[in-house]
Amino acid sequence: MNILKNIVRVGLIVTALSFNLVSCDYLDVVPPEQAGLQDATKTRKSTLGFLFTCYAGLQEDDSPIGHTSALNGSTDEFALPIEWRNDSGAFWDDYAYNLVSAANPDGLWNNYYKYIGQCYLFLRQVENNPGETLLQEWLPGEKEQWLAEAHFLIAYYHFALLRKYGPIPIITEYVPQSTPSSEFGGRCHYDYCVNWIAYQLDLAAQNLPPTREGPEWGRATSTMAKALKARVLMYAASPLWNGQFPFSSWKNKVNTPGDKDFFVGDDAKYKESIGRDDYGIELVSSSYNEKKWERAMEACQKALDFALNEGGCRLYGTEASDMTLYQTELGNNDKWLPYVPGKEDNNIQENREFKERVMMLRYMVASRYPHNKELIWGLTGKNINSRIQGRIPAHIFQTGNKTSWAGGFSAISPTLYTIEHFYTEDGVLPEEAASTGDFASRAEWFQKAGIAGNNREDIIKLCVNREPRFYAWMAFDGGDYGSKLLKASSGDAGSPCVLNMKTAAGHGYDLTRSPRNYNVTGFMTQKYVNPTAQFVFDGGAFQAGDTKPIPLIRLAELYLNLAECQANVGGANLANALANLKEVRDRAGVPTTTTVPEQSKLIEMIHNERFIEFWNEGHRYHDVRRWAEGQKYFGAKREGLNAMVKDVPFEKFNVRTTIDQPFRWNDRLYLAPIQNAEVYKNPQMVQAYGY
């Protein structure tokens, strides 16, 4: 995200980011060599820098690639070494083990409100204290656009709070430091929050451009605003917030006013069926409202249509050039095609096309190239290289001086649930395919697949005849990791790392080598690892390639959001839901049934498609919660292979094994707690249920 580079370039920093609802300390944005806040809006350059600081809160987000955050590390997608629970800023174990406490929660609550305050401070200064130079330098329409960007960010930060904490206080203006505690805001009803955020996004979209290019990419657009509104409304229509909230006795201390004024334009038709005159002290509605799904469906359709037209978006991989990008990046040589068991012969056109699709899918999430128009919004993660290394194999090769080993941490370990819920090559789950004789029987999954070749004989049947996304993003014993990861000599162009997950001499378990960095399940992930990533022979330096931005909103989400809404509305919309699901599966090279399934089956298919397509992109934490299925997915035991044994033979390694960590679910985890201090100092605030 080029914005962050611009923050440094303009030399404008945040020096007193302490805004929160308790102390009401204000934000002070002061250029380091200037006198005070008014200088922040003195010129066009300084004001633009001030605006960029409003985006800095995105770096405080639960980044999809931040594996130790609650957002990722607590889900059933992958497991981490238990020692990583002690890392600075690690909260994954609190949510995975049901240990989260209001005495010491993560700091996202204060961070988001801090940046909401930052945005309102920007709005106040631009409106009330623009410098004379700024007034002369402003380009036509620029002021309105910058204000719209701040309003977009205010809406986003409120949504980021809402999806994690449930009903929240809505901040509508800059809160001065002198505000007495009796005037602090309490939580608002969940639906009120949703309708206010949707309204703010509508207003912001009116003055935002549909696209941005070059150094402006990553700043707010109307395409982003419409896509975010669609997501907000889909979340609100989902079971947890639409009749299945488990804590009916959880009430507010203050009344939430009515919200019918927020229903304008296309939403006006829902004013009476969704809006209210007054919410009283209720925090979450206890009844189901089908109109929420209809409203969400309409917003999702409009967001998708706008993205495809005004937004200029398309699914990556739908043009021929997408399939051959690896040739531009790595060279026009078959050696760079990925290894896929059973598809070794590149002279067979079907094999070649399959492998090119695998490479395309790796590039889709690892980089943003000028022709990749799928990424609607992306984030440059903090310390990207170290987070990429967290998923790369350890102990790859000895460096040039033979005194140390190059490699990553091997730690991001996909669970067996993950491995078993990517599709087969025929587009069905392995268990379903096994029941019809179209895949190895479940009893044979951990047996050798009979693959010939150098170090390939230990590939198991579960890892053969799988879909392209499986080979793009997963890695397994006997398979390849990366494309040119090993540069084992000064003249070497690089080659893949052939995984040996069973032995300490390979990439397996060995606490003497590292007491905290090891693989937990016997599987690894290559998602986000650029095909050009490489460890260099001399010194073992890691070159990650182009690893940014990390997806926040992709066009594929708009298709699947719409499909989910259509499937839940049902009726004639089921066929449309299947068609939108098919768009994503076609790009992935996965066949789709032509017969419209029954409603519950189709919803299940869409849910699993989200699991695969958005694996490790930060959706799973929120999806399982909004579906009200926490116990089903996060309360069950988590499994891998018998990988945490040193130098284990094939037969003992390939055994279904329960991960030895205390994973637990409690329904209180549907909401995150806020700090007790917030409740003690704010007489209007109620703590999340169960804390």
What are these regions (language model features)?
Residues 1-33:
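Bacterial Sec-dependent N-terminal signal peptides
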Residues 24, 112-115, 196, 256-291, ...:
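Long, intrinsically disordered, low-complexity segments
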Residues 24-71, 460-464, 474, 675-691:
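Membrane-proximal, proline-rich intrinsically disordered regions
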Residues 43-61, 66, 83-165, 180-217, ...:
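Conserved, well-structured interaction surfaces
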Residues 133, 140, 167-187, 240-295:
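Short coil/linker segments at helix-helix boundaries
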Residues 147, 154, 229, 236, ...:
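Structural register within alpha-helical repeat arrays
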Residues 162-163, 167-169, 232-244, 568-571:
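Short coil/turn linking the two alpha-helices of tandem helical-hairpin repeats
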